[in-house]
């Protein structure tokens, strides 16, 4: 019995740290009149299982994680109400709104094609009674692509991409080189943008770590608290599990040794 317990404790201590991925502390930067989307998701990416109003997620399915080329689990939402008829009517109305919202969100990103790379996951399929907004926790190396919303055109001198990178010991997103302006005033902004581009053509230096960083936007308190909570809770549970296993192993070893010692004394 002891060798099996020792092996279980050893596996727990070695597997838990190996699953760790460096999460991006903040959300990707927002660009006015533009939306961003990931073409694929790197290993370790976490998606919260959020449910719309009137529904709640199952306790054992708090989030789903990208592992290999697929997501670790499927989110599920259950109703808070026991009224069957009211639940059906509400679900139908919410489903119609959800379909419209999903269609509107997909319009500006129709020209984007999802990558099919090893170690990446595609966009997770929607689950029943899902919230209209998805909350992702990206990992280092993740890139997101930006596009202007309908009615706006892009003014850019560089790629409309933001990448989560490690800089000076902290993770942060690069600033996308994209400005979205009204289609009716696009020609005016284009002329002024060309004149400014000739004056401000010096590339940014990425070799040194300045004291005050301007590349990465400051997060809101709510975003920081949410992402820190997911990260700390996950590792607190892992550490507590390892400690529990170690204590159990020590107790079982002590009891076994005591039993053998008493048995040996009786034989003497």
UniProtKB/Swiss-Prot annotation:
The chain crosses the membrane at residues 237-257. It is found in: Membrane. One of its GO terms (cellular component) is external side of plasma membrane. Keywords: Disulfide bond, Glycoprotein, Immunity, Membrane, Receptor, Repeat, Signal, Sushi, Transmembrane, Transmembrane helix. It holds the Pfam family Sushi. Residues 86-109, 189-219 are annotated as: Disordered. Disulfide bonds join 24-66, 49-75, 51-77, 121-164, 148-180. Residues 1-21 form the signal peptide. Glycans are attached at residues 33, 43, 116. Residues 258-268 are cytoplasmic. One of its GO terms (molecular function) is interleukin-2 binding. This is Interleukin-2 receptor subunit alpha. It comes from Mus musculus.
